[in-house]
Amino acid sequence: MKKHAIAVMMIAVFSESVYAESALFIPDVSPDSVTTSLSVGVLNGKSRELVYDTDTGRKLSQLDWKIKNVATLQGDLSWEPYSFMTLDARGWTSLASGSGHMVDHDWMSSEQPGWTDRSIHPDTSVNYANEYDLNVKGWLLQGDNYKAGVTAGYQETRFSWTARGGSYIYDNGRYIGNFPHGVRGIGYSQRFEMPYIGLAGDYRINDFECNVLFKYSDWVNAHDNDEHYMRKLTFREKTENSRYYGASIDAGYYITSNAKIFAEFAYSKYEEGKGGTQIIDKTSGDTAYFGGDAAGIANNNYTVTAGLQYRF
């Protein structure tokens, strides 16, 4: 009888231990494991479109496309299935077409360091801009009011512009004039896609909370499309394995136990990637391809947003 009692006690202790361990691996599906946020803000930045002589590496052309105070809407949905893990989906998009600016410089002479041709296009619109980001965070260090860890994710970002009208100076000032007002000259779009790694941190004191995030990628693939409407030419470029750096910080205050108002600043830098270019003649249908480092694609941008976060 005594042996049976001991056996029952051992089975009970073992079962409780197994249950406790298995419970650690059961994801939290309660509503308070889910957090969502919505914010509005502005986007600013600049993209560069470059053309090179593949034989000498000399820069032949550079177009600077600016983004100026474009209104954005940003959303975030995160789930914390375990105390040491957070799954997150977030993104932002322009709310409408916005203001931009474009300057086009050409270096047609190898015998002079300065540009030979320039056109300026103040009437440039940002047709759209958007980004989405899917990531997972693993919290390696946790305390009562802080946590820090690593992150990995996938991100895609897109921009599009149209330049109309403008003025030009060609052949070192030999030809000076204006393009027809309101007529499309050049349309340009970029797309960046990449996996990334990074570091994340969170700190809270009373009702104040601050979050920081650093992201890095050495595996950026970039695509662009350049439509020269007046010349009826299309230029398409693709680059691989360029670098990206990103950082964001947000600070907020809990107005209730579940709701927080916050402001965020986020910065992204896509370093120049170089690759081949395809040229399509829209009139004849002829195409040509130049391999090597014939073209370059780059962008840097930042957003400033403010909004509301809610934990269910």
Swiss-Prot record:
Membrane topology: Multi-pass membrane protein
Signal peptide: 1-37
Cross-referenced InterPro entries: OM_adhesin/peptidase_omptin, OMP_A26_sf, Peptidase_A26_CS, Peptidase_A26_omptin
PROSITE patterns: OMPTIN_1 (PS00834), OMPTIN_2 (PS00835)
Active-site residue numbers: 104, 106, 226, 228
Enzymatic class: hydrolase
GO molecular function: aspartic-type endopeptidase activity
Entry's Gene Ontology cellular component terms: cell outer membrane
Keywords, sorted A to Z: Aspartyl protease, Cell outer membrane, Hydrolase, Membrane, Protease, Signal, Transmembrane, Transmembrane beta strand
One of the GO biological process terms: proteolysis
Task of the protein: Protease that can cleave T7 RNA polymerase. Specific for paired basic residues.
Protein family membership: Belongs to the peptidase A26 family.
Protein name as annotated: Outer membrane protease E
Organism: Salmonella typhimurium (strain LT2 / SGSC1412 / ATCC 700720)
Lineage: Bacteria, Pseudomonadati, Pseudomonadota, Gammaproteobacteria, Enterobacterales
